[in-house]
Every structure is written in C-alpha cells, then in structure tokens.
UniProtKB/Swiss-Prot annotation:
Subunit comment: Part of the 50S ribosomal subunit. Forms a bridge to the 30S subunit in the 70S ribosome.
InterPro entries reported for this sequence: NA-bd_OB-fold, Rib_uL2_dom2, Ribosomal_uL2, Ribosomal_uL2_bac/org-type, Ribosomal_uL2_C, Ribosomal_uL2_CS, Ribosomal_uL2_dom3, Ribosomal_uL2_RNA-bd_dom
Stored PANTHER family: LARGE RIBOSOMAL SUBUNIT PROTEIN UL2M, RIBOSOMAL PROTEIN L2
GO molecular function, one term: transferase activity
Gene: rplB
Protein name per UniProt: Large ribosomal subunit protein uL2
PROSITE patterns to which the protein is assigned, alphabetical: RIBOSOMAL_L2
Positions of the UniProt region annotated as Disordered: 28-54, 224-274
Length: 274
C-alpha cells in the first residue's frame, strides 16, 4: 500500500490523502454474491428521521460476506482476489473452495491472491485460517471473533482491527481488545488468525465535504447554531456556549457520558476499556 498526497490543483484536492493498493481487483465484483441495498435516508416506515446525518450517496450493492466460516471445515480455499467493499473499511477476499463454491470473507492483513486458506480444528496456525479459540495458541493475534458459537464474527471486523488471546481457563479464553478492554469469550467460539487488512485506512483524508456526501453522510449541525425549538443548546442573543453541559438534541448527556447498558454481559469483562 502507498500513501499518496494529492497536489493542490484545486481547493478540493489540496488536503486529499489517498491510500492506494495496487493489489485490489479493478473489475466488477462477483455477481452471485451481491444483494440489492436500498437507501433509507435515515427514515423509518413513518418517514421520521431515526438516524441523523444519513442521505444521498452513491448507489451500492451489498457484498454477502461469510462471517461464520463453520460449514467448510477441512475444505481448502484459494484466494482469487482482494476487493474493495464500499460497505466497510476493511477489504474483502474472494475465496474459491475446492468444491467449486465462491465466498467473500474479510481480507486478513498479508493475505494476497493465490494464497491457500482453510477453516476447522486441524487448520494450521497462519493468518487467514479460521478455527475455534480453544485451538489457537496463547499470544496469537486474531480478528473476526464470535461472541456466541455459530453466530458469526462480531468483534474486530473493521480495518486494522485485531485482538490478542492472552489466557485460556476452563471453557473461556481471555482476549485483550484494541480498546484496552479484557474480556472472556467462550473457547468454542471461532476466530480468524491475524489482523484485518487496510490498516492504513485511518491515514486517509477525504479533503472536502463533497467526498463525505458521496458516501451518504450529511452535515452535522451544532446545537448552539440551532433555535431553542430544535436543540437544548439553541437560541440566545449572539453567539453562546450553550449555557449548560453538553447534551444531545433529546437532553441526554453527551461527550463522555457512559452509554453502555448491557448489564447481562458485564460479568464477561475482566477489565474495562481505557
């Protein structure tokens, strides 16, 4: 991968920083693994805004990514190509299994076209192979981690993400996440070895507001710039600071307020994130 800074030929190009990967497939995606993706504009079935800052953007297809990797145990697969996916920050890899089926997976870092991958208890310890956490050596770096056996990967799926397996005790293993959190996960859950590809994603700069609009993201308006009817920070004569601690448009504390409410899984957290 290469980090490319654009020359300031226009105001919109001045701050553009691109991450260029020459290995990415330049053709169309694999059609049988595409699904229609409808735009909602952030509205529900009543037409009311349920998620702010969503609207517009380029038309996209959803790529069907295999997050489970549990029904092809022992069947080797060849990486046909690495592709761009507009629906996520990570790249995806198209696998051709020995039985003739093709599937997309999250592309692990260091995996390229022509590599052989396999899933299952007997899979060798190398990046891209998927197996149960109880079969992975302590100290290994993993991604695409399940929280419930068979449910599919839920942890460490975005660009550059990973976790480290630091202990194994009984039916649980302990993972250290990138956030600093340490948590227990059932040893029967699956994970993929290595870290997620496209770790340079955070180094890019879109350069202009329009590039954000191409991605379907609308502007975020500050509460202090609104009227009192629209936001608790709105109104006032001239410019104000809002007059109170930061809150959301509905009056809930924001900017640092704890939002985690899943007490059921608190017992699985060994150490809270930093």
């Amino acid at each position: 991968m290469a980090i490319v800074k654009c020359k300031p030929t226009s105001p919109g190009r001045r701050f553009v920083v691109k991450v260029v990967n020459q290995e990415l497939h330049k053709g169309a995606p694999h059609a049988p693994l595409l699904e229609k993706k409808s735009k909602t504009g952030g509205r529900n079935n009543n037409g009311r805004i349920t998620t702010r800052h969503i609207g517009g953007g380029h038309k996209q297809h959803y790529r069907l990514v295999d997050f489970r990797r549990n029904d092809k145990d022992g069947i080797s697969a060849t990486v046909e190509r690495i592709e761009y996916d507009p629906n996520r920050t990570a790249h995806i890899a198209l696998l051709l299994y020995a039985d003739g089926e093709r599937r997309y997976i999250i592309a692990p870092k260091g995996v390229s076209a022509g590599d052989q991958l396999i899933a299952g208890a007997l899979a060798p310890i190398k990046p891209g192979n998927a197996l149960q956490l109880r079969n992975i050596p302590v100290g290994s770096t993993v991604h695409g981690i399940e929280l419930k056996p068979g449910k599919g990967a839920q942890i460490a799926r975005s660009a550059g993400a990973s976790a480290q397996l630091i202990a194994r005790e009984g039916v649980y293993v302990t993972l250290r996440l990138r956030s600093g959190e340490m948590r227990k996960v059932l040893a029967e859950c699956r994970a993929t070895l290595g870290e997620v590809s496209n770790s340079e994603h955070s180094l890019r700069s879109l350069g202009k507001a329009g590039a954000k609009r191409w991605r379907g993201v609308r502007p975020t308006v500050r509460g202090v710039a609104m009227n009192p009817v629209d936001h608790p920070h709105g109104g006032g004569e001239g410019r104000t600071s809002g007059g109170r601690h930061p809150v959301s448009p509905w009056g809930f504390p924001t900017k640092g307020a704890k939002t985690r409410g899943n007490k059921r899984t608190d017992k699985m957290i060994v150490r809270r994130r930093k």
